[in-house]
Amino acid sequence: MMMDEDVEQATLVSYSDKPRTFPDMRSKTYSPLIIRILRNLNVRALSVLLLLSFGGIFYMGARTSPIIVFVFVVCIISFMLSVYLTKWVLAKDEGPPEMVQISDAIRDGAEGFLRTQYGTISKMAFLLAFVILCIYLFRNLTPQQEASGLGRTMSAYITVAAFLLGALCSGIAGYVGMWVSVRANVRVSSAARRSAREALQIAVRAGGFSALVVVGMAVIGIAILYSTFYVWLDVDSPGSMKVTDLPLLLVGYGFGASFVALFAQLGGGIYTKGADVGADLVGKVEHGIPEDDPRNPAVIADLVGDNVGDCAARGADLFESIAAEIISAMILGGTMAQKCKIEDPSGFILFPLVVHSFDLVISSIGILSIKGTRNASVKSPVEDPMVVLQKGYSLTIILAVLTFGASTRWLLYTEQAPSAWLNFFMCGLVGIITAYVFVWISRYYTDYKYEPVRTLALASSTGHGTNIIAGVSLGLESTALPVLVISVAIISAFWLGNTSGLIDEKGNPTGGLFGTAVATMGMLSTAAYVLTMDMFGPIADNAGGIVEMSQQPESVREITDVLDAVGNTTKATTKGFAIGSAALASFLLFSAYMDEVSAFANVSFKEVDIAIPEVFIGGLLGAMLIFLFSAWACAAVGRTAQEVVNEVRRQFIERPGIMDYKEKPDYGRCVAIVASSALREMIKPGALAIISPIAVGFVFRILGYYTGQPLLGAKVVAAMLMFATVCGILMALFLNTAGGAWDNAKKYIETGALGGKGSDSHKAAVTGDTVGDPFKDTAGPSIHVLIKMLATITLVMAPIFL
């Protein structure tokens, strides 16, 4: 079927619009304010600015610890490598003009939405920062802070500054993920015309750029805060704060990162899945046109959603995970060192920063190990990209074991317990093995090479209902193995830490919680490579859409289809990895919360008795919060999808020539509808997550005051946090796995199995996929952030619960 001249030239705009312009969005490429400022500086001024910045950073590092200097050096080198990867990717050709036109439209939509979304988030962040400032100006101080002369005003400004820096870095992490994705997609599409391996290499290196920046920013942001506070407060000098108490000042950074990540994930998830579901229901089910077909008015909105939902949101999510894990481990390391009277506690406090610095090194090696194949062509057999990615991951795992052993011997050796470092190294191995097992479990339940997804696809042959039943049962079943693995990991790491030989003044073992923290670090010790695999998914998905819309040969589409299917699996495995790390990190944050309450109340706070009615109610409220949050997130996608469906149907009715390529769809209208709806819908579930723990803690604090239970508010919040974490882990596992399985069952049928595209089995699978979309890309990932944000917000707000 021939297309008219305008469609052949890929003029993806409304009739009255200029190229690369969407209604209600913007008319020129958006760049953040800091980028625009840097562009206006000449090279000499920029060089001087960078030298002064680096000089200041290294000065503070040298005043703090040689370990901090090492962290700074590694982070800066990783940033330089990320610049190299960017230049390498951008040097690749963009392909023919029709590909470039489509890519420009996607980039405009993604950047325009992110500008509006981040503008909304920044306003809420400043409002919340003001609330935190007011609370901290009237809160109590810990005895250690009072002894060091740290007043309420200084403590308030420190926490607010940390919160805003965490929010800023989290926002940049998300923007970076989107920035590279919208520029790499067309280059992957172009490379797919030549060879599958070259396309794979470009997608991986583009994802690697984003991953290195995200992890590097999380590490260097905390390191800069730590060294700044260390120098400014003159830590460890007579009459000043002890270094073991310093990590408590960093909790605002974790809360800021969580705050931005939650709204980025909610807004991006609602956008991407609202557009995806709407496009699929009308395009595939009602009109039988292929995915990413240029006749579908919602296709550009769908492709934009891949970037703002999967790239920007996931970058902020992983940034927040790493920041929360580092801060909680630093708090626990400082607490343990203080109890054990370790002469130099800096190694135990800074150990998480060193582990993630090595993560940048080993993940870079893993990323660079994936190379193109010489003399390959589009006609060559398509090598399984998952095998290639798995080789890189295996190499990264091996290097992680070696560097983890070196780190523990360097930083965790103490004469009080000479073999303790070996026990903690074993804790790290537990975490590394847990990460590998989680990745394998996620692949097993979501890859169509294995039985669960094929069984789900077979259920599609008997109708829509059986597909839904099979998908729900698969998701429920998939929670069992991960929970068993997490349980074994926590118990093993706790036991290894407890038997490390580190004891307090009374002779009690004190290394258990820190052992669990080290296991969490082990699990996240390959986070940069795992994030690379995750970023690979949406880039490959976008590349496939560009190939389809630009009417490339079927052989090219076959390559991008393979990359897309693997990308779906890597996204699913990354979500499994993320929820596993979130589970361990939340356990650490819960322990850190109890330590902080003990410090503020100056009494022991080690147990939470759920036999107390008020405490049990707190647990129920925590469990309810997870279900209500998930319901509101899914409902938001449903309402957005309804608006898209109505708009697409309207265009098909009013412009019947669309199906025959005689009229052009109004892509911009769908983009504007989805963007507006996503920004509106993200507020309610986000506000629920932030307000609930604060309100519950404050109400029960008042109740405790009148009933003679001074710690009741803190206990109820602890129960709420505990139950929400447990329910959140299970709910996220169910939602992520069921959604990923539904998606890949559809893709398995699209390979030609069970009747192939257009068959009744395929239509049933599409229905399952639309149900699973908000599960795996909106509610599920948002719960990862939610359970960690609940922990960080309780850390920051702990004083008002007492």
Swiss-Prot record:
Q: Where is this site: Important for proton transport?
A: D310, D317, D777, K788
Question: Which residues make up the binding site for Mg(2+) 4?
Answer: N568, D743
Molecular-function GO terms, alphabetical: diphosphate hydrolysis-driven proton transmembrane transporter activity; inorganic diphosphate phosphatase activity; metal ion binding
For this entry, the protein name equals: Pyrophosphate-energized membrane proton pump 3
Q: Which gene encodes it?
A: AVPL2
Q: What species is given as this protein's source? A: Arabidopsis thaliana
InterPro entries (UniProt xref) = PPase-energised_H-pump (IPR004131)
Q: Where does Mg(2+) 3 bind?
A: D306, D541
Annotated Mg(2+) 2 binding sites: D276, D773
Catalysis performed (reactions): diphosphate + H2O + H(+)(in) = 2 phosphate + 2 H(+)(out)
Its quaternary organisation is:
Monomer.
EC identifiers of the protein? 7.1.3.1
Q: Which UniProt keywords are listed?
A: Golgi apparatus, Hydrogen ion transport, Ion transport, Magnesium, Membrane, Metal-binding, Translocase, Transmembrane, Transmembrane helix, Transport
Q: How does it sit in the membrane?
A: Multi-pass membrane protein
PANTHER family (alphabetical): K(+)-INSENSITIVE PYROPHOSPHATE-ENERGIZED PROTON PUMP
Q: Where would you find this protein in the cell?
A: Golgi apparatus membrane
Binding, Mg(2+) 1 = D276, D280
Q: Which HAMAP family match?
A: PPase_energized_pump
- Family that this chain belongs to: Belongs to the H(+)-translocating pyrophosphatase (TC 3.A.10) family. K(+)-insensitive subfamily.
Tell me the residue numbers annotated for binding substrate: K273, K776
Q: What is its main location?
A: Golgi
Q: Can you supply one Gene Ontology CC term for this chain's record?
A: Golgi membrane
EC class name: translocase
Regions crossing the membrane: 41-61, 66-86, 118-138, 160-180, 206-226, 246-266, 348-368, 386-406, 421-441, 468-491, 511-531, 577-597, 615-635, 686-706, 716-736, 782-802
